[in-house]
Amino acid sequence: MSSKRLRLIKSCILSLTLLVGISNALGDPPSKKVTLLLDWYPEAENAGYFYALTHGLYARAGLEVRISPIGPNASVEPQVALGKYDFGLGSSDQVLIARSRGVPLVMVMGSLQHDPVGVMVHDGSPVHTFADLEGRTVAAQPGLPWILYVAKKYQLRNIRIIPLSFDYAPFLRDPNYIQQCFITSEPPIMEHIGVKVRTLWVKDSGCDAYMALESSDRFVAAHPDVVRAFVAASIAGWRGYLADPASTDSEILRRNPAMSAIQLELSRKVLLEYHLVEGPGIAPGSLDPERMRNQYKILRTLDIIHADYDYRIAFTTRFISQP
């Protein structure tokens, strides 16, 4: 039997196993059209949802799911809060901030266990720690909580933030260039093309956000069975993607021509190496209330959240059923 045929058989068995697991967990699933708004274009960081879609996990759960991308200058949270989309991807800090401003969003699952955001420098850069960013210019998205946190923790009084171009060219041209990155994206690509880099992962500074699967209060209250079915299928999708990414990668490449197969492969390796989806004692989709409390305290200390509120309304664990 050829190795290609053997891989195909293994893929079919894995899909059937996941389908049976969801069926047993959910019983008779609801029939519902569901929309999901990504926080970027299709990529490895949202591949679990595409696995669930392409392998029929959503369909088996009674859900007809449409997944839409979003560009760099648009926001997920308002569109989900207003009901334009049933679910969206974002970050737990943004959900906490939105709730503090009266936006009725709720986090229903940890899409990734850690936000992969970081700072990338050339290997020859004198920047080795966050404290070394003092007096330097960093290309980043202005106003993000992690920037304010790092600046306060490391007493960065003279750090200059310039807009991130979402383009590799400035970094490749300038050996002193410093930019925001995703550890799953830019650093492995740079290494692949022969550019040596180092990365400071924001998580290691103590600012440890989740990547969030979020919905609106209204949708969760009106369709709890749909939320439960979508979360269960999405968790199964993440397990499936980590085990067998091939067909899902093909769908991502079809939807995002700017993506490459090698980039997907490199990003998936980082997802596994850094336990971004699951890790020792941590299952896909998990949410830790204590981590959410700590994150709320950070945002409150930074005065990004201006007044106290019950942070527990910003998330729920009731839809996360682990085997």
Where are these regions (language model features)?
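Bacterial N-terminal signal peptides that target proteins for export
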Residues: 2-13
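Bacterial N-terminal signal peptides
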Residues: 11-21
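Structured segments of extracytoplasmic/periplasmic soluble domains
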Residues: 52-55, 61, 79, 83, ...
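Secondary-structure end/capping motifs
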Residues: 222-304
